Amino acid sequence: MSAFSVEKIGLQDSQQFSKLFIDYLAQQEHIQPLYTFYPDMAGLETAIEKRSKQPINRTVLVERLKAQYKDLPVSEKVQQNIERLASEHTFTITTGHQLCLGTGPLYLILKTLSCVKLCEALKTKHADNEFVPVFWMASEDHDAAEINHFYVFGKKYTWETTQTGAVGRFTTTGISEVLETIKDIPAWLKDAYQSSVTLAEATRKVMHQLFAEYGVVVIDGDDAALKKEFTAVIEKELFEQPAVAVMNQTNRSIERHGYSIQVNPRDINLFYVKDSLRERIEKQGERFVVLHTDVSFSAGEIKKEVADHPERFSPNVVLRPLYESTILPDIAYVGGPGEIAYWLQLKEVFAVYNTFLPAIFPRMFSGVITKQQCVKLEKAHVTVAELFLSEFDLKQVVVSRSIQEEISIEAEAGKITAAFDTIASIAATVDGSLQSWAQAEKAKALKQLEDIEKKLRKAEERKHDDVIKSVLGIRDKILPNGKLQERQESVFTFLVNDAQLIEKLYQSLDPCTFNIQMCCYE
């Protein structure tokens, strides 16, 4: 099996990323106070040293992972990695995502492979340690509209459901009917949803099918025993509310440097979860109120509720990273630009809760270009990098390379300029007022020449319209709606025609190269 040929596009050149993200990777001085470890191998090695001094409850972690996997035929690599987590010499590199139908966009695959490859790279340098890639299921999120669809070959497939609350607890009713409408979708994907009661159960099966051979461990944080490890943070957030003040201070600093804020904290950064309910908790007077319900607690009552039912308290986006770092021996979190933006807001929140802040590592960025598309680009003499140009500039590139001789009136314009300058000089000797007239006539002549050039170019564009349409069509596949392909298309767009796609991506991509790595079939 041959891997892809890879063409690298600079992140800044692509015009797809925020200034904060670019400046973070460039190690700009004013960004450095927002993180502890820079995302490179040296930073990860320092994180290993620091993380080893902040232990977690590994016994509970291993027990709960085994329980979560009990109904699944676990691969040998995954089983080994779960067992390895019992050792203090084992560390995790984690990514997470919502429980999107059909895994959602391709970048979920890239995030997960980033974890796998970083773990393998560290193992070659630290033979005495073990490194486990972990996928965190965001099963407690409650935004159904963000997870109920995916795209295959540019078409959106949507699962309509009226269920509410934590999405991991949703039943899978109706998903099979959606998948039946998709041609050539793998049978195992349909079976994963058909054989599962909940969306969390189905998502674990899907991720296990895709990544079991790489040893990826899937964890569900919606777990009472794991939440019990987080109760100290839950109680402190309820009664002292320290996160909001320190995070707002960080946010003001970020805004002073001209960046946008990704996340704003609440006074209490917790939801109350029960059955199909997930609503924010707010302190109103002396009581803790669950918004949009008639549920409320006194201080004593909510303290008892935390002790008896920690699973009913769900961290929001501010505290979820702390929850992950509390129950996992993380040395790094792998995320996209948006995730990294809000992780950079959290350093002081981690500090106020005395929780380890892992390295914040960017995921790999990529896209897939078919063999047919590569051939068409080659015939048009267009590079992959040039697909990231504006539509106007890309058209100019196609036209200029499709014609035998460049259309340019530069030489003729020079001749006209010289001729009129001579005329102007002669006119000045006859009558000074005629000189400005001659210069005005020169401007008119040059403008007419420019109009002629535009008409010639338009005629040339029409002549090469088929080539232009072909190239722009490829561009629309690589950058649908102007965004990276990985942000829309599902992995199943490509798995349908190439069952080895994930292995090829694994073989071809480098997690420490901060570029867009476009993968071309050879």
UniProtKB/Swiss-Prot annotation:
Group of enzyme by EC: ligase
Keywords: Coiled coil, Ligase
Family annotation (Pfam families): CC_BshC, Rossmann-like_BshC
InterPro entries recorded: Bacillithiol_biosynth_BshC, CC_BshC, Rossmann-like_BshC
This protein's record includes keyword Cytoplasm: no
EC number assigned by the record: 6.-.-.-
GO molecular function, one term: ligase activity
Coiled-coil residues: 436-469
Superkingdom to which the source organism belongs: Bacteria
Family: Belongs to the BshC family.
HAMAP family, sorted: BshC
Protein name, as recorded: Putative cysteine ligase BshC
Species per Swiss-Prot/TrEMBL record: Cytophaga hutchinsonii (strain ATCC 33406 / DSM 1761 / CIP 103989 / NBRC 15051 / NCIMB 9469 / D465)
